[in-house]
Amino acid sequence: MINAKTTEEVALGIRRRVFEHSIRNNGGYLSQACSAADQLAWLYNEELRLGEPTLPMIPKSFAGVPSATNRDYHTGAGYNGPPEPQCDRLIIAPAHYALAAYATLIEVGRMAAEGLEMFNRDGSSVEMIGAEHSPGMEVHNGTLGIGLSTGAGLAWGRRRRGEPGRVWVFMSDGEIQEGQTWEAVQTAAYHGIDNLYAIVDVNGQQCDGAMSTVMGVGDIKAKFEVFGACAVEIDGHDVEAMRQAAKTSHPGKPLIIVAHTSPYRGMSPLKSRFPRLHYVRFKSERERAQMSSAIAAELGVAPIEYTP
């Protein structure tokens, strides 16, 4: 599926869309779009080998879990195309990045903009915290750390079947604090699962504040290497650096791209709130109006109209 937009245009569109949504709803996962927009844009617009979407452009309501009376159940992976052997698969590990992920699907033409109007509504599959039935999601990742494990298992199975398609995992740095992440890396390295790729959004902040004050993780690249992975460290806002990192030779090892980012990239007024940026809710109508005006100017759009 070819997109006429440049990756930089897609990334800007992601930030604009998440910003507009957050202003209208008096809050949202803004910082995740700031830090991850370039990575998600690059994955969907350039790196991933995906087929045409197999699900409706406007997502259907959640019909319930698989059962005898719900045989048409499907995951949200259909927005990434069919699971053909030659196609890549994407696991979005941090489920709270869902808003940024939906905005990405819209910007690359895999979901209609109207789908975002269903965000976080009762009965909607467009969940605030993405689940396996949410657009672009293939598995449930409510437990941080499980995404890389799932990706490793999927990649191992694909290799056993001789499928040429790769498995990509998009991760957040908070998951580095989870022991399951390191078990997955060690297992993938031991079994030589080199069709497993991951990019880690290292934005230095999490729900309880700055990573360094919650539980510092030290040299992430060095740790991945000690556990047997091939790791490359880059500026996570540099698209060319991502392109080159993905070309790194890594026979017999998973490839991990450690992408250092800013949680207020493109929305610098948010810097005053750091590190309390995990979920941005405006403290007053005055702050909301000020943020709307200042960030809109930085993103090159008009201030967002909203109902107080």
Task: Please provide the spans of the model-predicted regions.
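Charged, low-complexity surface patches
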Residues: 11, 29, 94, 177, ...
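N-terminal hydrophobic or amphipathic helices/low-complexity stretches enriched
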Residues: 1-14
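A structural signal for short, well-ordered beta-strand segments and their strand-loop junctions
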Residues: 31, 91, 256-258
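Glycine-rich ThDP/TPP pyrophosphate-binding loop and its adjacent helix/strand module
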Residues: 78-79, 87, 125-308
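Cofactor-binding active-site loop characterized by glycine-rich and histidine/acidic residues
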Residues: 21, 34-190
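Structural motif
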Residues: 26-34
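N-terminal capping segment at the start of a domain
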Residues: 11-27, 201-203
